[in-house]
Amino acid sequence: MILEIVQTGDPVLRRVGRELSVEEIKSSAIQRLIESMRDTMRAAPGVGLAAPQIGESIQLAVIEDRSEYIQDASAEQLEERNRSVIEFHVIVNPKITLLGDASAEFFEGCLSIEGYQAVVPRAYRVRVQCLNEKAEPLIIDAEGWYARILQHEIDHLNGNLYIDRMYSRTFTANENLAS
């Protein structure tokens, strides 16, 4: 089921999401929500979707960077961003640690701020400790584009948007970026 993606200005995007219990994660309601979030993310299309973006103030996000999303990028762009295919997965109740001092600055967009992008500085490497969709512990060490996606989605779970971190003078409509 495709869900409606809420847009900036909706108060749910500024709330810290509630953590889910193991029982909640395993419930049929949350499992159905995960499926709907996956379908919604793919339909948008996007590389991540956090529960607050569909109006649910809980600590849950889905992530996937499919081959068809990156097929038009040049080898240079993929290398510069350290971007590759990321299989579909779920993060629940994540805790993030920034690793090292290295950072990267690239344009980011958001399904909840349709039609705009801006340059956002992000840590180059992160470690995320969370639970997966089966409520099993998961540790993710990520760098490059994957680290950026994780930071973006975890920001959503904590009531933050990329516009809180962006270089404001780079904020632009997508059609202006393309030209």
Where are these regions (language model features)?
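Active-site rim/adjacent substrate-binding subdomains
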Residues: 1-151, 156-179
